[in-house]
């Protein structure tokens, strides 16, 4: 039977399998080979017959028939004439679908330049010809001639001539002595005449000779483009087009609207312009029109083609009839509405529905309630099939009727179909993978979807009118994936931090908390119960209450599997919760024998999950939910206005603060303090007052009081119960209800001095209400901005990390990171245990005392190991990290560690990059948007002392101290550190001690915990003298460089260094304090390093010594107030995270020393200081830095500085950290800084997610030495690619290339990904595609995005496994086919096949 007939209803060609996609510039021959005919007329369709015009933009002869198997004139109809070309109308009889595939072309009368290669930066045409873009445009748009062949004249090649100059040159040299051309023909000639090989060699030679950096950059840029053309096989002249392809008509349709009008695609207008102008130009050339007219027409053709390719890129935008810019071919691809993001990455799906959600507390965790109406519609095909199978209907039509009439059989069948067929529920916005989960549907009446209350946290759903979408997985594979991977019962842990996400909230927490409360003097106190039955009996008969203190016997499984009973002091309520605990030897009653706040419930669920596994946990969660709801209902907790207790002392505290504020006002009026100081003091006072009122209120609300009549404890305050349990509300909200609202901010972010004294219970005055509206309104505006910003951050993160997939089990690297606890101001913010849990140990972890191996290298660090490590007192552990993983594509499982959402080692094919991006992006909306503006006392300056946090022995590193005249030990070095070692000599803690601090301990001293080690003045930076002697001043001229100011409040005068450069007379001054060796001041004391004891002063320095005073080493001679350094804006929240991921250089960034050495001062500039570091390593060159003169600089000449020390304080630029301290330091800096922002909001994110993103930012290397490779210094190359090329070079005995790792921001890194499809769909589509086409890039489809775009399974998860199997199968097929070809007998091939099958089975 004919294969075609078999294929009648599904005439689909077999899908082509391909491994990669290449993009290059289309040559004119290529364009003609695509085309089915030339379009000569601008007409579209005939206005009377509505049939396409011949040779027009919709011509049926060129593009194919309008109706299936029917020619235009109607002579041939039906399938039997397939493939015949009608002799009357010239149309081929075939499917009308070909009108989506067949292209046409337009033959241009004059060549035109392709605007992408002309204008898309860097302009390829201009760079290649080594002309400026302006010059090229002048030639292209017919303003100037260009000399293409100078001959023997004095003209130069590529010289531009205006009309007049051209005429003069003709007069002077004669017309045939030289050639000068104009327009795209000229550029075509120049490009076609280029000898690329020769140019490349010349450029390389020139590069080797040139020394100027600017010239090098220019040459490299040109050489890169020349090499791109050479490698890709593109010819430069193809950037000038002689034929233009016309896209198929069904992709630019003309649609009839009712009322006889037509809607058309903008492309038709743009094509029409090109055809009209081109035809006119042809006519003019035939008519031998004057040159000026022809040139004008050629320019118009060039402009029309420009508009077709990229409207608005050059000249004015071409608009349609309604003044709207026309959408050109480029606009079709660009942006959110373009082809990539709208159609290829954002498809709509069938078999889906959406409805409002309501709570379904009687559902099990793996179920959802699906309205019957929806289910009937969604599962239609399945129902039709079953009706047919059971004989209720014989055709689809009959089945349809039955379903429409809702016959009773249909409902029975629907029940059957739905049983165990999971559906997917999704709530927008889907910020992380838990936003889509699978459930088994339960049919319900009504029209709302029922959702299980415990999964609300994951979906971030509530029942105030939220809607959710339902999707039906159709194929067996999809159902399998939904059940195994996406079922809500399989997603108990949060992928971002591994904590349970199925946690009771609100009512459930309140019910459980109520159950676990203990009350004094309740009936039946002190009774003992032997089992739970007795207890229930006693509760029923009101012998005891839920909160009575009793003794209860709890039975549990022992380690040997036998029952063990134990007596606990507890309450009946807690025993009821304990009843639900799974029977497991590891789980004791202690975890419920406490107040069940939300935190404790979460810990309990986590504990149960770790010890009993998933199934038990799910059952336990469901039971706990039921119990919570039930007792929340029975408790009947509600609150009235009397529950908000206003503290009695409030009025007193407010009055005291008001008096203080008045006093500050008076001091300001008397001129004792400045406006700023007054503001800070008042704000500070009110802040403290608010806190104190809140504390008093909390004391009142928490207080336990007894009923005088019965002697029983009165019920707890309901508001306190809700807030304390974590069910709803916070201490802050309680404060606003019953304390005082406190200070409010203006829209600019400044704090308004007058606070809101009232609370909501008392009610606000009009003034207070007005002040409070500022903040509230700003909050709403911020939220809207925040959502957009956070979404964009997530999009950039996903884009940069989408190709990080677990692709190997173990890469076998010996590199890793060192993890230590994070300590902030003496507090441990992240313990070592938290940071290393679920990571792989790099080397054996040894016990510091016994030396025994706690954990072998390469093993996963589990909870039990963490306990051992912390017990042993280990302070740092080396672990493997995605950052140091050496897998070629993706990351290996060992370096990644535990899959946080499963609690097991990560599987191969897991898309860890996307998970990392989601984990960082999802909490983005919780971060703040504001930049904190801090001033004066509103912010508490760093602590001013240091206490020992461990007991042990002190060791001082880089000891450099002096005893000053008061007998204190003063720190004289800038990199001195105090270590505390325990009795085993192991470092417990290291503190850097700042310059000028007083220390109270010395080497070898034994310290106790809490003993003070050092203290310093946090408000000033001291300048100390290093030698004993007498003070002398240099260039301290009153009124020019110093001034005396009296402190009004104390009357003490102080001498202050002022800006001496402000006055022209003082421009040459260099104010300094010098130390004389003798009292007369004849000789200057020498420092022990050899320099003179001269201390330069900077502006704002306060002098602390008088002229001629005797000073000892370590005495303060001047001090610089830190106020100026402290009032800086701190970028917080989302902008800070974005700044770090984009690797931007912060404003006023720190300057970091690149080498260790000695500081010298060089000759300064007008407003810059030159600082030179002479390296300790003789082989290195001295390094110079320029520092703005007014900036605080605290080194003196001759000081030692270590590599990585800050020469100038500020936020370091991440690039500097990478260049100076290396990858590990950069990683720990970025991880800690990003974590700090999230920690402030109480968001937990595992470090490994940030490390995965940082890994993606560090993929590139900048070539410094090209060796024998083909690279040019300055090239950015993929790190792994470079390693491979170097391995080959070394193997061949050649010189490898070397380079430095460079840090790219996430946007830049996404655009530089090896896949051009992924980069084009991200941002700057035209630029990416232009670049890819010129260099003939090949996309090997490694990442997720490219595969989604070309419509294949993604190479992650199950898709990865399938494609792997396919790949192996394809290789084997080839082997067998080859064998069959080679040998005439088929036996060998059969034997091979049997072997292969056996091999697969054994695997």
Curated annotation (Swiss-Prot):
One Gene Ontology term of the molecular function aspect = DNA-directed RNA polymerase activity
Keywords of the record, alphabetical order, are: DNA-directed RNA polymerase, Magnesium, Metal-binding, Nucleotidyltransferase, Transcription, Transferase, Zinc
Stated EC number for the protein is 2.7.7.6
What the record notes about the co-factor is: Binds 1 Mg(2+) ion per subunit. Binds 2 Zn(2+) ions per subunit.
Q: Could you tell me the gene encoding this protein?
A: rpoC
- What PANTHER family does the record tag this protein with? DNA-DIRECTED RNA POLYMERASE (PTHR19376), DNA-DIRECTED RNA POLYMERASE SUBUNIT BETA (PTHR19376:SF54)
Name of the protein in question:
DNA-directed RNA polymerase subunit beta'
Any idea which positions bind Zn(2+) 2? 811, 885, 892, 895
* Positions that bind Zn(2+) 1: 71, 73, 86, 89
- Necessary cofactors: Mg(2+); Zn(2+)
The entry describes its oligomerization and partners as: The RNAP catalytic core consists of 2 alpha, 1 beta, 1 beta' and 1 omega subunit. When a sigma factor is associated with the core the holoenzyme is formed, which can initiate transcription.
Q: What class of enzyme is it?
A: transferase
Give the similarity note: Belongs to the RNA polymerase beta' chain family.
Query: What does the UniProt record say this protein does?
Result: DNA-dependent RNA polymerase catalyzes the transcription of DNA into RNA using the four ribonucleoside triphosphates as substrates.
Any Pfam family matching the protein = RNA_pol_Rpb1_3
Source organism per UniProt: Bartonella tribocorum (strain CIP 105476 / IBS 506)
One GO CC annotation: DNA-directed RNA polymerase complex
Q: Does the keyword NADP apply?
A: no
Q: Which reactions are catalysed by this chain?
A: RNA(n) + a ribonucleoside 5'-triphosphate = RNA(n+1) + diphosphate
Residues the record lists as binding Mg(2+): 462, 464, 466
Lineage in the entry?
Answer: Bacteria, Pseudomonadati, Pseudomonadota, Alphaproteobacteria, Hyphomicrobiales
Q: Name one GO biological process term.
A: DNA-templated transcription
